[in-house]
Regions:
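Oxidoreductase cofactor-interface core, primarily capturing Rossmann-like NAD(P)-dependent enzymes
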Residues: 1-27, 31-38, 52-55, 62, ...
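Short, conserved active-site loop motifs that form the nucleotide-linked donor/cofactor pocket
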Residues: 43-44, 138
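Cofactor-binding loops of NAD(P)H-dependent oxidoreductases
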Residues: 49
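A hydrophobic C-terminal alpha-helical subdomain
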Residues: 220, 234-299
């Protein structure tokens, strides 16, 4: 039995689907049974639980051989790091109680740092807590910058006529599709090779900048003149709050961006076959961004 946290999300859905396709028994954990229905209809066992509830998670993990764990985002929380720490505490306690032997945990570039990285601090804390479970083999997948983070640009292009972000336009980022993270996690669960605690970075197909993003998106949507605007952090924070994010979460995201711009958050591994994933940004734009952009334009 395999257990997947965040199964209705971008990475967890892929993990669960890959495991099912390999004819494995899969238990999926989510906050809402309706969100789990697409996977339940394919044969997974649903388990509705609050991820801050260690007792409930221990029941969900009971009898399982391996688990995929992550901290589901909660962008409206007034205390995002406090929330992520409660999730980490619950996951660690539940894994230990259930005696799970093999664990794959979603983390991030920059998780080696204990402060100054915005929400990534929560992933640092998750790693520290899972490191204390002596009985479990844990693989931390430290992923790069999600390509999905650029989906919000569809609205920016429609409203402002440009791509806008506080990220430096020339900053090369290891952008990765979340589907590739899910595939890597599923493979690690199906073919466990971790002894003790290990870290593996996932750096996408190549490093690209927001200047590259603008060029690729502009070509794909028929706007080759599309420009990039670097937005000041304070202005960006206000935009995020307008969109429904808590002020604290918006502040943390600006802190993360500042750390990226300063070179504080970066890959520790040299790019190699093991940390390079197949989906390039051009494919992501064609298959994910352009449909989202057109759907917004038609709304």
């Amino acid at each position: 039995m395999y257990v997947v946290i965040g199964a209705s999300g971008n990475t967890g859905h892929v993990v669960a689907t890959k495991l099912l396709n390999d004819n494995k028994k899969v238990r999926v954990i989510g906050r809402n049974s309706a969100h789990l229905q697409p996977l339940t209809s394919k044969g997974t066992e649903p388990f509705v639980a609050d991820v801050t509830d260690a007792s409930a998670l221990a029941k969900a993990f009971h009898g399982a051989d391996a688990a995929y764990v992550m901290i589901p985002p909660n962008i409206t929380s007034p205390d995002p790091l406090g929330h992520s720490n409660r999730v980490s505490d619950a996951i660690a306690a539940a894994l230990q109680k259930a005696g799970i032997r093999n664990v794959v945990a979603l983390s991030s570039n920059g998780a080696e740092l204990s402060s100054g990285t915005g929400p990534i601090v929560g992933l640092h804390n998750l790693e520290q807590k899972l490191n204390q479970i002596s009985s479990a083999n844990v693989l931390f997948l430290r992923a790069g910058y999600f390509m999905e983070n650029t989906l919000g640009q569809a609205n920016a292009i429609r409203q402002m006529g440009s791509v806008a972000s506080p990220v430096r336009p020339d900053l090369k980022l290891p952008m990765i599709a979340t589907s590739d993270i899910g595939t890597a996690a599923a493979d690690a669960l199906l073919h466990p090779a971790t002894q003790g605690k290990q870290t593996r970075e996932l750096l996408g197909q190549r490093d690209i900048s927001y200047n590259d993003v603008v060029t690729i998106i502009g070509k794909a949507i028929g706007k080759p003149e599309l420009k990039y605007v670097q937005v000041p952090g304070d202005q960006f924070r206000g935009i995020l709050v307008q969109m429904g994010m808590s002020g604290t979460m918006a502040k943390l995201l600006v802190e993360m961006t500042d750390a990226m711009n300063a070179g504080k958050i970066h890959a520790l591994e040299h790019r190699a076959a093991q940390n390079t994933t197949p989906t390039d940004y051009e494919t992501f734009v064609a298959e994910v961004f352009v449909p989202a952009y057109r759907q917004q334009a038609a709304a």
